[in-house]
């Protein structure tokens, strides 16, 4: 399959009880004035461009190398002077390296900084979206790896984003050293 407008915004999360749950927002644009755009984050390497050094597991014998995750940091849907941005699961990763050994508070702050930069007006403009201000975040889903970190994670998110509705869940996240991952949605204007 060829992804002509980039990969989707996505989050891959573990579960505590097995099984699979899929939540999909799909858009079929028949209106030529609607644009679907990739939003990269210069603070983080695109997941689909990760080096072999950070990819987990063994290489499939049928492939020349390990395959990368196929998602964008965010996708924006833009029409004329407004739109939405879908923020993929974001963690305390700079470049392609995890922030290790700093605890839940610092990982949460770094994750929020990554998201704030991702949806900043300057970054949106750099991505081809003529937004006049930062995206207004309207919801978060917060994935916390360890129960003992849940309250601290809530406190940091609430202090940084006091009026933002958020759902918190206890579940595994993308790398063993990471303690939190956050996805969200924002309004663009």
Model-assigned labels for residue ranges:
Residues 1-189:
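N-terminal presequence-like segments and the immediate start of the first folded domain
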């Amino acid at each position: 399959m060829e992804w002509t407008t980039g990969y989707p915004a996505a989050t891959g999360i573990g579960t505590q009880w097995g099984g699979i749950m899929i939540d999909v927002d799909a858009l079929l644009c028949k209106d030529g004035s609607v644009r679907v755009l990739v939003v990269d984050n210069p603070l983080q390497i695109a997941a689909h461009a990760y080096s072999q050094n950070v990819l987990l597991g063994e290489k499939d014998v049928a492939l020349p190398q390990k395959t990368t995750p196929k998602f964008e940091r965010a996708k924006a849907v833009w029409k004329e002077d407004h739109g939405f941005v879908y923020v993929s699961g974001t963690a305390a990763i700079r470049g392609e390296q995890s922030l290790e050994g700093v605890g839940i508070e610092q990982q949460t702050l770094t994750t929020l900084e990554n998201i704030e930069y991702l949806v900043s007006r300057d970054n949106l403009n750099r991505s081809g979206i003529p937004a006049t201000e930062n995206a207004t975040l309207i919801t978060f889903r917060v994935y916390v790896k360890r129960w003992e970190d849940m309250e601290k994670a809530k406190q940091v998110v609430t202090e940084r984003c006091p009026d933002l509705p958020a759902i918190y869940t206890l579940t595994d996240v993308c790398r063993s050293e990471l303690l939190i991952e956050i996805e969200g949605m924002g309004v663009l204007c």
